[in-house]
Design a protein with these regions (language model features):
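Short catalytic micro-motifs in class I SAM-dependent methyltransferases
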Residues: 111-112
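A conserved beta-strand element that flanks and buttresses the S-adenosyl-L-methionine
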Residues: 108
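Conserved Class I S-adenosyl-L-methionine
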Residues: 25, 180-233
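A short glycine-rich, Lys/Arg-flanked "PGG" loop and its adjoining helix->strand segment in the class I
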Residues: 120-132
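Class I SAM-dependent methyltransferase SAM/SAH-binding core
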Residues: 46-48, 52-96
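Short alpha-helix
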Residues: 166-180
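Conserved class I S-adenosyl-L-methionine
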Residues: 1-40, 54-58, 75-78, 137-159, 197-201
Length: 233
C-alpha cells in the first residue's frame, strides 16, 4: 500500500472523529487566525491539506475566497457539508498542487507536514502558488531540539498512527523556509496538553498497536505547536 493509500484509509476510518475535534477547536482557531494573520478581506486563500476544513473555515469570514485541497474523499465530504459559500473543496495532493504559479494571496497548511513523506515539497508548492508579496502560513507540531527526545517522540507518534512520517524541529522548518526564500514575519509557539486515551482514539489506534503506543507515550504529554507567518518576496 502506498503512503497516500495508507493516509486515505486511516483518515477515512476516523473522519467523524476528526470532524468532531474540528468543531470543538473552531472558536479557538478562528480567534488565533484573526490575531495572527493580517488580512484585508480581499484575499484568495489556499488551505493545503484541509482535512474537514478547520483552517478554511477560520479564514472564510476574513477573506474573499478559500480553496481547500484535501487527499481523502471522506474528509472532503464532511467539509463540504458544512462549508460556507466562499469555501470550495477539491481533491488533490499537496506535494504537487494543481494550480498555476502565483494563484493565491495566502497559502496555508495546518497540522499536515508530519503526515507527508516530503514536507520540503509542500513548502515549495505553497511558495510557488503564492503571489510575490503574499503570505504563507505554516502551523504544525514541532519536535524537541534534543535529537534523542525527538526520536522517541516520533517513534511514539508512528506507533500511534502509521501515517505519521516525522515531526520536524523548529530549526528544520526554518531551513525549509530559507530554502524557498520565504521571509519570516512572525513566529509563535503554543503548548497543547494531550490526554493519552482520546489521542489514541483520534488515530483509531486499537488492540496490540494501542498497547505498544501507550508503553511509548511521553509522560504528561504536552505537544508544542509552531505557528509561522512568512512573506514571499
Amino acid at each position: 500500500m502506498s503512503t497516500h493509500d495508507a493516509t486515505r484509509a486511516r483518515f477515512a476510518a476516523t473522519a467523524d472523529r476528526l470532524a468532531a475535534l474540528q468543531e470543538r477547536r473552531a472558536e479557538e482557531l478562528a480567534s488565533r487566525i484573526r490575531e495572527f494573520v493580517p488580512l484585508t478581506g480581499e484575499e484568495r486563500a489556499l488551505d493545503a491539506g484541509a482535512g474537514t476544513g478547520a483552517l478554511a473555515f477560520a479564514l472564510a469570514p476574513l477573506v474573499r475566497e478559500v480553496v481547500a485541497v484535501e487527499l481523502v474523499p471522506e474528509l472532503i465530504e464532511r467539509g463540504r457539508a458544512k462549508a460556507p459559500p466562499n469555501v470550495t473543496f477539491v481533491e488533490g495532493n499537496i506535494e504537487k498542487l494543481d494550480f498555476a504559479r502565483a494563484s493565491f494571496d495566502l497559502a496555508g497548511t495546518l497540522r499536515t507536514l508530519h503526515h507527508v513523506p516530503r514536507p520540503e515539497l509542500v513548502i515549495a508548492e505553497l511558495t510557488r502558488v503564492t503571489r510575490p508579496g503574499g503570505t504563507v502560513l505554516v502551523a504544525d507540531q514541532i519536535a524537541p531540539n534534543d535529537p534523542l527526545a525527538a526520536g522517541e517522540l516520533n517513534t511514539f507518534e508512528r506507533t500511534r498512527d502509521p501515517t505519521h512520517t516525522r515531526t520536524l524541529a523548529d530549526v528544520d522548518l526554518r531551513q525549509l523556509f530559507e530554502a524557498n526564500s520565504l521571509v519570516l514575519l512572525r513566529a509563535e509557539f503554543v503548548r497543547e496538553q494531550r490526554e493519552l486515551e482520546p489521542y489514541l482514539d483520534l488515530a483509531g489506534c486499537e488492540g496490540e498497536q494501542r498497547e505498544q503506543a501507550k508503553a511509548l507515550a511521553p509522560r504528561d504529554y504536552t505537544a508544542e505547536l509552531g505557528w509561522y507567518l512568512l512573506e514571499k518576496r
